[in-house]
Amino acid sequence: MHMSWDADPYTVDITEIEGFDDLHHAEGILKEAQERAARIYHADETHFLVNGSTVGILSAIAGVTNKGDQILVARNCHKSVYHAIYMNELNPVYLYPRFDSELQLNIEISAEDVRRALNRYPQIRAVMIVSPTYDGIVSDVAEIAKAAHEKGLPLIVDEAHGAHFGFHPYFPENANQKGADIVIHSVHKTLPAFTQTALLHMNGNLVNREKVRRYLHMLQSSSPSYILMAGIDQCMEMLDHHCEEVFDPYVERLKRCREELGKCEHIRLAETKHYDKSKLVLSVAGLTKGLADTYGAEATGIQLQEDLLNQYHLQMEMAAGTYVIAMTSVGDTDEGMKRLIKAIYELDKKYKP
C-alpha cells in the first residue's frame, strides 16, 4: 500500500473493494503490510489500528481476562486502561511508580514490586504497565516480563510513546524485544504517521490471540480508513528501507540540543538512568520567576509553557507541576531545535533559585 503525501485524500478514500483487502479479514495487501510491520518490530503478529492505541489497549485487556478477574495495573496507566477495567468489570490491583523527589517526577515501576504483588495476590490474571511514560520514564520491561512469566501470566505494555524504540542504539529496544506478550504502539506520536494510527503486537503462547482479534473486530471501526492504513504502511516503508538515513541525523540533532540545554544555569533537563532521550523534560523545580508580580512564588511548568508559547511561539507537548515536556521526533529540524535552545537560554535568566 502506497500513497503520495500530496495526493488528494478524496481520491484515495476507498473502502473494501476488490483487490484492496479487508482489515478485519486480511488475506491480501493488508495481511502483507501487517506481516512486514511485525517483522520490523520483532513481533510474532501485528495488527494495524485506526482507532488509536486506545482500541489496542481495550482489546488487549479484554482478550486476556474474564469478567471479575484481577489485573495488576501500574497506577500511572492511560485512562483507556481504566475504561477497559470498567467495561470488563475487572478488579485492579495497583502498582505505584516510585517518586523522585529531586526531579519531582514519578519514575519507573520496579520488577521487585511486580513480584511482591503477584505473590500477595495469586488470583491476578495479567500484568499491565506503561513504558515509556508520558514523561519518558522507561521501566525494566525484560525483568517485569520475567516476573509475569514466572507465574504464567501475560504482560501487556502500553508503549504508545515508544514507537521509535529499537530503531537506533540511542533509544531503548522495544517491548517486543524485551519479552512482552502484547505491545501497543502509537505510530503517530513519535513517527511520521497520521493521528490515531497505531499498532498492536502479540508474542508467545500466553495470550489467547483469537480472543484479542475478536475484540479488535468488535471495538475497531468496521469502516477503517484506507488513508490511515496507507499512512501506517508508508511509515513502515520508511523504517524498513530508510531507517538509518532518517534516524542518524535526528539523533545527532537531538544530542546537540540536549548538550546545549544542559548548559543552562537554572532550568535543567530532568532525566533518570532509564529514560527516553527523545523527550526533553525541562524542569523549573526549586526556581522562582524573577518578576515583581510573582512575589517570589515557586515557578511552575504552566508558567514556563506559557512563556514559551506567548513569547517564542513554541508549543510544548504538556506542562505539569514544575516541568514541561518538549517532544521531539525524526520530523524535527535544526532550525526548530535552535529556536528552542535560544528561548530556554533567554528564559534561564528569568527563572532563578
Question: Which residue ranges define each predicted feature?
Answer:
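Glycine-rich phosphate-binding segment of PLP-dependent enzymes
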Residues: M1-Y41
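Conserved beta-strand termini and adjacent loop/short-helix elements that scaffold enzyme active sites
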Residues: L49-N51, L95, A319
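Short N-terminal amphipathic alpha-helices
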Residues: A33-Q34, D44-V50
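Conserved C-terminal alpha-helix-loop-beta "cap" of PLP-dependent enzymes
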Residues: R256-P353
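Generic structural marker for isolated residues within well-ordered, non-membrane alpha-helices
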Residues: Q34, P172, Q305
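Short glycine-rich or small-residue beta-strand-to-loop segments that form or flank ligand, phosphate
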Residues: F20, H47-L49, V127-V130, I325-S329
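Conserved PLP-enzyme active-site core in the AAT-like
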Residues: S4, D13, H25, I40-A43, ...
